[in-house]
């Protein structure tokens, strides 16, 4: 959807000069307006992705050329006096955007003569967008101390004159604090000469800034470098993606192998019961019939069985143990040592202490020979300890001669 709108800007200095000229004379005044017209397209995109383009035309009135006498360039019928008009404009014909007229004690309505004159000016100046500024003044009080000044900007549109919104710019207006989309007032001739002298240092012949051109060149170079970097980054990202895919595949393969191992071998090991050490079980049952050790659970792999063994295997433990140990383990000294221990339990007094010392010496001499078969020593020492406890249960102060384990 496209639309058009027109607005006008009038400098505060120009408006002040027009008012001063009008109030300084006793008759009506008229003249020409200089400036330019600029168009700006505003594109608004809504949520429905529809473009709303509006073209805004801004009429910037920058200067004025006064005519110090009425009917100076036209007659009473509204016909133009071209030589007089050319003399008044004097080469500024292209800068004319309209004309103005001050009237006293009248309404804000264009007269028929003014309409004819405006039409003739459009044809002579070849400007169909020519505007007409009408200013009227009236006395508000009987003492003529207060005047009312009205102004309106008229523009022909489709055969009719329509009023155009006119804004008189001033230092106190908020619009001056924002960005200006139109040019300011006409610069002085001295400023124009200074800019023209140093123009070649900042501008090219086409009017573009040199710094802007250099920045654009740097921007293009950065874009080329960025394209190269993007291609390198793309290659690296693809390699990383490939590596991540391989890693995920390896992880899946490891998980499959673990699952297969658990389903095939792991579950089988968990279901199998550990084998029972029958010889050790029978030995513990023989030498510790009334001890809590008969409920202990022993296995080859050190794992706890679900059930406790309470079966008598009917194995002659002494025969089996004799076959399992070496001959050097059963020396004469050990046989004598066992006999002496049994006799020593029944004796009391100083002789028993001497025998105890001799037995301790014998134990230290034969200590290195006791590492071959731990099960035999455990059974013999445990049996001797049980016999001593049964023979002398009340003598709690007597020193224990059995080894502690």
Curated annotation (Swiss-Prot):
Residue list for modification Phosphoserine: 402
Keyword Phosphoprotein on entry: yes
CC terms in the record's Gene Ontology section: BRCA1-A complex; nucleus
A Pfam family assignment: MPN_2A_DUB_like
PROSITE patterns: MPN
Coiled-coil ranges from the UniProt annotation: 208-262
GO BP, one annotated term: mitotic G2 DNA damage checkpoint signaling
Compartment annotation: Nucleus
GO molecular function: microtubule binding; polyubiquitin modification-dependent protein binding
Processing and modification events after translation: Phosphorylation of Ser-402 of the pSXXF motif by ATM or ATR constitutes a specific recognition motif for the BRCT domain of BRCA1.
Keywords: Chromatin regulator, Coiled coil, DNA damage, DNA repair, Nucleus, Phosphoprotein
UniProt region (Disordered), positions on chain: 365-405
Locus of motif pSXXF motif: 402-405
Function: Involved in DNA damage response and double-strand break (DSB) repair. Component of the BRCA1-A complex, acting as a central scaffold protein that assembles the various components of the complex and mediates the recruitment of BRCA1. The BRCA1-A complex specifically recognizes 'Lys-63'-linked ubiquitinated histones H2A and H2AX at DNA lesion sites, leading to target the BRCA1-BARD1 heterodimer to sites of DNA damage at DSBs. This complex also possesses deubiquitinase activity that specifically removes 'Lys-63'-linked ubiquitin on histones H2A and H2AX.
PANTHER family (alphabetical): ABRAXAS FAMILY MEMBER, BRCA1-A COMPLEX SUBUNIT ABRAXAS 1
Protein name: BRCA1-A complex subunit Abraxas 1
Organism encoding this protein: Gallus gallus
This protein's encoding gene: ABRAXAS1
């Amino acid at each position: 959807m496209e639309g058009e709108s027109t607005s006008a800007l009038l400098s505060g200095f120009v408006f002040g000069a027009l008012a001063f000229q009008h109030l300084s004379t006793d008759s009506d005044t008229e003249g020409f307006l200089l400036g330019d017209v600029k168009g700006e397209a505003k594109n608004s995109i809504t949520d429905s992705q529809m473009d709303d383009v509006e073209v805004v035309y801004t009429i910037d009135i920058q200067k004025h050329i006064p005519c110090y006498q009425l009917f100076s360039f036209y007659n009473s019928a509204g016909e133009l006096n071209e030589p007089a008009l050319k003399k008044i404009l004097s080469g500024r014909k292209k800068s004319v955007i309209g004309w103005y007229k001050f009237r006293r004690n009248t309404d804000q309505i264009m007269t028929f003569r003014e309409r004819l004159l405006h039409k003739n000016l459009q044809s002579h100046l070849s400007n169909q967008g020519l505007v007409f500024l009408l200013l009227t003044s009236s006395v508000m009080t009987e003492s003529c101390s207060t005047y009312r000044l009205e102004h309106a900007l008229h523009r022909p549109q489709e055969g009719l004159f329509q009023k155009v919104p006119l804004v008189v710019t001033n230092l106190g207006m908020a619009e001056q604090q924002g960005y200006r989309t139109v040019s300011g007032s006409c610069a002085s001739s001295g400023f124009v000469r200074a800019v023209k002298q140093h123009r070649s240092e900042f501008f090219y012949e086409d009017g573009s800034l040199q710094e802007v051109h250099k920045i654009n060149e740097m921007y293009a170079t950065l874009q080329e470098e960025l394209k190269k970097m993007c291609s390198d980054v793309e290659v690296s990202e693809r390699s990383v993606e490939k590596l991540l895919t391989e890693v995920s595949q390896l992880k899946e393969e490891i998980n499959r192998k673990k699952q297969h191992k658990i389903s095939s071998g792991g579950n089988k090991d968990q279901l199998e019961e550990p084998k029972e050490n029958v010889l050790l079980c029978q030995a513990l049952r023989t030498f510790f019939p009334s001890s809590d050790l008969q409920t202990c659970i022993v296995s080859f792999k050190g794992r706890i069985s679900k059930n406790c063994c309470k079966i008598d295997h009917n194995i002659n433990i002494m025969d089996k143990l004799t076959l399992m140990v070496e001959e050097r383990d059963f020396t004469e000294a050990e046989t004598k040592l066992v006999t002496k221990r049994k006799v020593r339990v029944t004796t009391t007094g100083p002789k028993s202490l001497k025998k105890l010392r001799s037995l301790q010496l014998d134990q230290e001499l034969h200590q290195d020979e006791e590492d071959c078969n731990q099960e035999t020593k455990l059974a013999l020492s445990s049996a001797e300890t049980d016999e001593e406890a049964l023979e002398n249960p009340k003598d709690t102060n007597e020193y224990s001669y059995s080894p502690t384990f």
